[in-house]
Amino acid sequence: LGKFRGTPDVLPFPKRVCFDAETMPLGRRDRKPIVWAFSLSRLNGLLASVVPEFSGAADIRIFDKGFEAAVEMAREAMHAGEEVDVFVSAGANGAYIKRHAPVPLVSITPTGFDVLRALAMARRLSERVGIVTFGRAPAELEQFKELYGLHIEQRAYETLADAEGAVRDLTSRGIEVVVGPSAITDIAERLGKKGVFLHSQSAVRDALNRAIEIARVARAED
């Protein structure tokens, strides 16, 4: 657990206990899947707009927390007896939580259509457009550039420090509009540039569907 290992005042995550069909507590066997979504900034609003669609299929909670704060909150809640089957998050926040999570984590990943939509929106704002993605840039980006003969500056990041550096580099090169996840758009706007949010309701919906399916499969195998 990284910096938490060996820290006496911070408890480790409790171990998951598996039950067979005969011994599994009735509440666990019959309840809906429980999903916790950890997000920051604009992604919170997107999650809040989609989660009501799943009210009959799962118990989904949204936490406005990220990185160490999210890990600590989840640890404390689980030690207090709260149950959760799957985490959902995105980008660097999701990657960090996944490294420490005792349950599966599903990442909210922008679709090819999300990339094309966001770039088209950015191009309406300025011809000086850049995109910063978590990890490798989607293949659709190159297709978009070739199709329209556009020069779009692109960068990738793994950590928040990378994200800050990438956006600053783009703005120093005259980029006026930056496309990316909420962390990227927040940085761009703080630097006086326009930000276009990359994620969509469709991407969130897909991640929640996958999380619910993972929870159902895991409980069936317990």
Predicted regions and their residues:
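Non-catalytic structural scaffold of enzyme domains
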Residues: 7-222
